Design a protein with these regions (language model features):
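Conserved NTP-binding catalytic cores of kinases and kinase-like/nucleotidyltransferase enzymes
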Residues: 1-85, 202-205, 318-322
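ATP-binding pocket architecture of kinase catalytic cores
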Residues: 43-136
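A glycine-centered beta->alpha junction motif in the catalytic cores
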Residues: 98-111, 149-157, 275-292
Length: 322
């Protein structure tokens, strides 16, 4: 989260008036993240998060907002978009598309244990199942097509060694995407960015998943792989912590058992998930936008993760006891 667009007191109060949500008492920019403008907004009626969308268009946004509402109605703990009397959930603030959602209680667990991983794995599977009947469809906008378009823009900033690894892995993923086994992977609406800092815990209770603005229709295995590459690793090396890895996968498996094709492709998809975030971090670092409070993430982290996934594949059959 970051602040690209300044929001005034009067602009925030105007939105609150429109939604009949009381008087503004505090408006505070949120540091962290790299896509949208975010504020903590407190009124006499409660605590909220105001998001102004800097890259997504008003045509793309209904998918994300209605997905959150769909999940919230089905008892998945996610922020619920506030709506006006006409049921509208997308508004305009400071000339940008905007939404207001309830603020989740608690804090992110940045040093998760196996127990945290078990809880998140369980809820991730429940979220995937809850979204099966979600009627809107939009591709993952940071998927393979975006990788193909973006890599040529960042190669000039890289060492020959990094360029070689990036191009080799991209070619591997392009080839994989054409395989029948890949095309057989189950799909649905996924979060696609469920890192540690996008989950809230209130003590040891999971209070919610948030920041759905990279969501899209993709394979459930990709979504699981994104999570495993963050929740279950040593952040210094990118290597898996076996206790957390086993806890996450087994919890997910108990709710939604992995198919044969998913078990076959879990290692290539772990590589895909690492590649996706290596590319986006390189892009954000070398082709940045101006913003208050913006902090670019270190792309070398996901270079290390990708290398760890390539050279140290996991043994899913052993983890699942097959």
């Amino acid at each position: 989260m970051a602040v690209f667009t300044q929001v005034t007191h009067d602009q925030a109060q105007s939105l609150l008036d429109h939604l009949q949500l009381g008087q503004l008492t505090e408006l505070k920019g949120i540091q962290g993240g790299i896509e949208n403008t975010n504020y903590f907004l407190t009124s006499s009626e409660g605590e909220f998060v105001l998001t102004l969308f800097e890259r997504l268009s008003a045509q793309e946004l209904p998918f994300y907002l209605h997905l959150m509402r769909h999940l919230a109605v089905r008892a998945i703990p996610v922020p619920k978009p506030m709506e006006n009397d006409a049921g509208q959930i997308l508004f305009e603030v400071a000339g940008k598309p905007a939404a207001l959602v309830n603020r989740l209680k608690g804090a992110s667990e940045l040093q998760p244990t196996a127990q945290h991983c078990q809880i998140v794995g369980d809820m991730l599977a429940r979220m995937h199942l809850a979204a099966r009947d979600f009627e809107l469809s939009q591709p993952n906008l940071r998927g393979l097509n975006w990788w193909i378009q973006t890599v040529p823009q960042i190669l000039e900033f890289l060492t020959p060694e990094c360029s070689q690894l990036l191009l080799q892995e991209l070619a591997f993923q392009v080839d994989l995407s054409a395989q029948p086994v890949f095309k057989s992977l189950p799909k649905g609406a996924v979060h696609a960015d469920l890192f540690r800092d996008n989950v809230m815990f209130d003590e040891d209770h999971l209070s919610g998943f948030f920041d759905f603005y990279f969501a899209g229709v993709d394979t459930w295995l990709f979504d699981l792989s994104v999570c495993l590459n963050d929740w279950c690793i040593d952040l210094k090396t990118g290597s898996f912590d076996s206790q957390r890895l086993h806890a996450f996968i087994k919890a997910y498996q108990r709710v939604r058992p992995l198919s044969a094709s998913e078990r076959e492709l879990i290692n290539p998809m772990l590589r895909a998930a690492a590649l996706r975030f290596w590319i986006s971090r390189l892009w954000d670092l070398h082709l940045p936008r101006e913003a208050n409070l913006l902090k670019a993430h270190d792309p070398q982290h996901f270079e290390r993760v990708l290398k760890a996934r390539i050279f140290h594949p996991i043994h899913i059959e052993h983890i699942l006891g097959y």
